[in-house]
UniProtKB/Swiss-Prot annotation:
Ranges annotated as spanning the membrane: none
Keywords: Acyltransferase, Biological rhythms, Cytoplasm, Melatonin biosynthesis, Phosphoprotein, Transferase
Factors inducing expression: Exhibits night/day variations with an increased expression at night in the pineal gland.
Designated gene of the protein: AANAT
UniProt source species: Mesocricetus auratus
Protein name: Serotonin N-acetyltransferase
InterPro entries xrefs: Acyl_CoA_acyltransferase, GNAT_dom, SNAT-like
Site (Important for the catalytic mechanism) location in chain: 120, 122
Phosphothreonine: residues bearing it: 31
Length: 207
């Protein structure tokens, strides 16, 4: 079998008409889906953390999940996450894990209980340039439908500050009282949502 010399592998210089390179660049960009929803992987962890850090550190001085915890959950239970990508760029995400008790505890912040029937939503965040566009609402609705398609998951639970309770109530969450979990001086309300109605809506929506 003939061998190719290094010189034969070197491409000839290609001369393109003015503007062609910009056109080809646009073509390459448009090979990516304009909008895609998918479960996250450990390879997405850095992008996730960059969005989360900007969204939470400036407001509360802390993050719901740090980078090692993000990788931990995306390794153990990627099916309980959902990311929204625009042309390959992560713009919003939710990360969850399974929990096996009636109410959240301090342990629930870092544990995944494979036998649990409750999906604990640890964090929902939107990239700063995509906020105030309704993306958080769309993503949460899709995420609850996604959970509703998993037979083992019966309900969703989260904790949030009092000001955010009305937002989550629009999606079927109900406040069950103050959360036992505290983060520094921050206190939270605990909310729960049955997934049966979301599973029914998914089956009848054709999604």
């Amino acid at each position: 079998m003939p061998m190719l010399s290094p010189h034969s592998l070197k491409p000839d210089t290609l001369h393109l008409p003015p503007g062609t390179s910009e056109f080809l660049g646009c073509q390459r960009r448009h090979t990516l889906p304009a909008s895609e929803f998918r479960c996250l992987t450990p390879q997405d962890a850095i992008s996730v953390f960059e969005i989360e850090r900007e969204a939470f550190i400036s407001v509360s001085g802390t993050c719901p999940l740090y980078l090692d915890e993000i990788r931990h959950f995306l390794t153990l239970c990627p099916e309980l996450s959902l990311g929204w990508f625009e042309e390959g760029r992560l713009v919003a995400f939710i990360i969850g894990s399974l929990w096996d008790k009636e109410r959240l505890t301090q342990e629930s912040l870092t544990l995944h209980r494979p036998g649990g029937r409750t999906a604990h939503l640890h964090v929902l965040a939107v990239h700063r340039t995509f906020r105030q566009q309704g993306k958080g609402s769309v993503l949460l609705w899709r995420y609850l439908h996604h959970l509703g398609s998993q037979p083992a998951v019966r309900r969703a639970v989260l904790m949030c500050e009092d000001a955010l309770v009305p937002f989550y109530e629009k999606f079927g969450f109900q406040a069950v009282g103050p959360c036992a979990v505290t983060v520094g001086s921050l206190t939270f309300m605990e909310l729960q949502c049955s997934l049966r109605c979301h599973a029914f809506l998914r089956r009848n929506s054709g999604c």
